[in-house]
Regions:
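A short, N-terminal "cap"/entry segment at the start of jelly-roll beta-barrel domains
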Residues: 1-35, 115-116
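Conserved short histidine dyad/triad with adjacent acidic residue
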Residues: 22, 36-53, 88
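Ligand-binding pocket scaffold of soluble enzyme catalytic domains
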Residues: 32, 46, 68, 99-108
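Short, conserved beta-strand element in jelly-roll/cupin
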Residues: 39-43, 52-68, 107-110
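Short beta-strand His + acidic residue motifs that chelate non-heme Fe in jelly-roll/DSBH
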Residues: 48-50, 68-69, 86, 91-98
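A short hydrophobic beta-strand segment most commonly corresponding to one strand
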Residues: 58, 85, 99-116
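Short acidic-glycine-tyrosine-enriched beta hairpin
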Residues: 72-88
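Beta-rich strand-turn-strand
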Residues: 74-77, 95, 99
Length: 116
């Protein structure tokens, strides 16, 4: 068993190569094998760049109001308790609404050491 205590980790800013606006990444974890994830907090208007995941991505919205979009689809609003699944290779972005911050737990699997 491995317990990661709240406050025992170092927060980091989302790099500008992958995010627009202020984004904070907390509590990254690595599970068995290739599973990883973390809590990502987006300031109002902040979002990811368009990207894909080789084995897909699951988002669990925990706070605020967010927006998600897959390539060719409409922008969808998400709220706490909503779960979003992006298929492997599906081009998409996700982030906060224009006026409200959003926080989600992102869970990914890596393929050959790459999750994005």
């Amino acid at each position: 068993m491995d317990i990661k205590r709240s406050g025992d980790h170092v927060s980091r800013r989302g790099p500008s190569d992958y995010f627009t606006g202020a984004v904070q990444i907390d509590a990254p974890f690595n599970g068995s094998g290739a599973l990883s994830g973390g809590t990502v907090t987006f300031d109002p208007g902040a979002r990811t760049a368009w990207h894909t995941h080789p084995l897909g991505q699951t988002l669990l919205v925990v706070a605020g109001v967010g927006r998600v979009q897959r390539e060719g689809g409409p922008v969808e609003q998400v709220r706490p308790g909503d779960i979003v699944w992006f298929e492997p290779g599906e081009k998409h972005w996700h982030g906060a609404s224009a006026t409200t911050a959003m926080q989600h737990l992102a869970i990914n699997e890596s393929l050959d050491g790459t999750a994005v």
